[in-house]
Amino acid sequence: MFEGIGGETLWRKEKQRPVKELIDFHMDWLHKKNEHDEWLSDRDGELYIRVFFPFFWKNFIHDKIFLSAGSLAFQSLLSLVPLLSVTLSILRVFPVFESLNRYLEDYVLQNFIPGTGTMLREYLNAFIDKTSSVPLLGVVFLFIIALSLISTIDHTLNEIWEVYAPRKIVQGFTLYWTVLTLGPVLIGSSLVASSFVWYTVFTEGPLLELKTRLLSFLPFLNSVIAFFLLYMLVPNRRVRFYHAVYGSLLAAVLFELSKKWFVFYVSHFATFEYIYGALSVIPMLFFWIYLEWVVVLTGAEFVFCLGSLKPKKSISEPFDPMRGIDEILVVLGWIWEGQKTGTPLSMKSIMKKKRALQPSRARSIVDLLLQAGIVHGTANAGFAVSSDLYETTLFDLYTKIPGGFGANESETRGNGGAILPESIGHNVTAGIKSAMTIPLATVLQDKIY
């Protein structure tokens, strides 16, 4: 239903709009929806889905998921042996887990590194055995490598949630240390419990075949739980329970599909073995870890978008360039200062600035400045001013802003919204121009903003 904005006629007409305009229209409608509407109708649900996926894809590209997955895959490959060494070392402290080491290896290799054969097991066992003779300083170094991987995961996920304020050192170290030390114990405990249930319930009694099939879903269930805890606990921001559930289900399904595809690829298209020979296990392992991180970050982006795109009325109004001119000047001033110091600001650096400016609004302002040609991107993913701010006036800025004086030169409106006659409109524009001849450099240097 579209009460208050045109009814059925508007529903038919809006389908004929260009894609970008259509998405903007849908987003605006979703934010203007009555806040008392707790549920979406069928048509509203269809509209929400049509808006959600472009919104998800835009954030997916903006957050550079594929690039982040590659970075995490490389660091994971370097941290794999230290992480497994630390995990097994902690498990060896508890005698009850001593018999589970072999089972843990089988579980990890079968469910998380499929299709790589026994070669990987032999290499990992050889590397891990060598770490047992490492001196104390080397053990500390292994812990540092493992902690750095956990820290990188934490920072990457929080960037997706647009949380750029770093955790306090004590808080971050406590969190990472808890994950590293208690994580293996919890994994071992779950394996003990699973083994107990297997031997006492699933290996005897009626319906043995059905029980065996149900047990085959255990890896999928473990994946759902792991993804849920990751999306629920790691972001330094409140995440709704059901959003984390939906994201963990999506990630678990993609994870199972990627496992099947990877096994099929390795068994039917042995490209790595032909090219790399005995060293093929390294690129195969890297490729698989890369796929895993793409799945993990895709699920995280999905959870973030579920929490960001709301069908109910938005608390914050959409950004109005004309009313937000002071915020535009603030961002322009940051970019100009960075350019003068020789360190162009990136989007991440702009969002980290200590000012009451929402990350989404800062992104909208940068996009607006780019579209207006006021700033441009640099080779190192930063931004720089495109024109001489000593020659560009405040009026010039207003004419380039969407909805500003240059939006429609043939129409000038009064305070009541009525279109003024052309002659009066030109006089009004000329008067405003003469009053706004101050250069932008002067505005920014005097810190009028």
Swiss-Prot record:
Keywords: Cell inner membrane, Cell membrane, Membrane, Transmembrane, Transmembrane helix. The keyword Zinc-finger does not apply. The keyword Protein biosynthesis does not apply. Disulfide bonds: none annotated. InterPro entries: UPF0761_bac, Virul_fac_BrkB. One of its GO terms (cellular component) is plasma membrane. It is a multi-pass membrane protein. It comes from the Bacteria. It is found in: Cell inner membrane. The chain crosses the membrane at residues 77-97, 133-153, 173-193, 214-234, 244-264, 277-297. Belongs to the UPF0761 family. This is UPF0761 membrane protein Cpha266_1653. It comes from Chlorobium phaeobacteroides (strain DSM 266 / SMG 266 / 2430).
